[in-house]
């Protein structure tokens, strides 16, 4: 029997700027390249667990915007059940701006967006599956 993993966490669209070094206050530097990727610790954990053959219940919250629609399709493509992917009409999908140096150092600015609206009320929706889960994973980046 495969373990069932319940993941409660964030989903962010990451804007990753590869830079030669961290810049100083007031200084502008040019990025060597820019990559847009789907990320967020919660989503990464859910997708990796699914790829390892586990049954995954992933609760997150996306905005109803272009990024949210794209992210939803990405999660479905990765085999994540959309039943627990909630949507917020007022807030955009979470985003993170990641500065990544050639030495592998990073600085991250995160805007939680819809992730920040995940609530205790939303968690009550999971009441039917809490007992089924063998493992519970949370990142403590959401306000629940």
Where are these regions (language model features)?
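Short alpha-helix plus adjacent loop in nuclease-associated cores
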Residues: 93-96
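Short, glycine-/polar-rich solvent-exposed loops and beta-turns at beta-strand/coil boundaries
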Residues: 89-91
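Glycine-rich phosphate/adenosyl-contacting loop at the front of the ribokinase-like
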Residues: 1-61, 66-70
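Ribokinase/PfkB-type carbohydrate-kinase core domain
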Residues: 1-11, 57, 61, 72-87, ...
């Amino acid at each position: 029997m495969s373990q069932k993993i319940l993941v409660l966490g964030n989903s962010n669209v990451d804007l990753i700027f590869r830079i030669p070094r961290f810049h100083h206050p007031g200084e502008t530097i040019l990025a060597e390249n820019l990559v847009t990727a789907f990320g967020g610790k919660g989503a990464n954990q859910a997708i990796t667990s699914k790829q390892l053959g586990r049954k995954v219940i992933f609760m997150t919250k996306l905005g109803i915007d272009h990024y949210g629609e794209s992210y939803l399709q990405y999660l479905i493509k990765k085999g994540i059940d959309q039943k627990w992917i909630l949507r917020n009409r007022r807030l955009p999908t979470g985003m993170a701006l990641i500065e990544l140096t050639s030495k592998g150092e990073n600085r991250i600015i995160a805007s939680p967006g819809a992730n920040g609206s995940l609530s205790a009320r939303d968690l009550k929706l999971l009441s039917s599956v809490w007992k089924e889960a063998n493992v519970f994973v949370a990142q403590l980046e959401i306000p629940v």
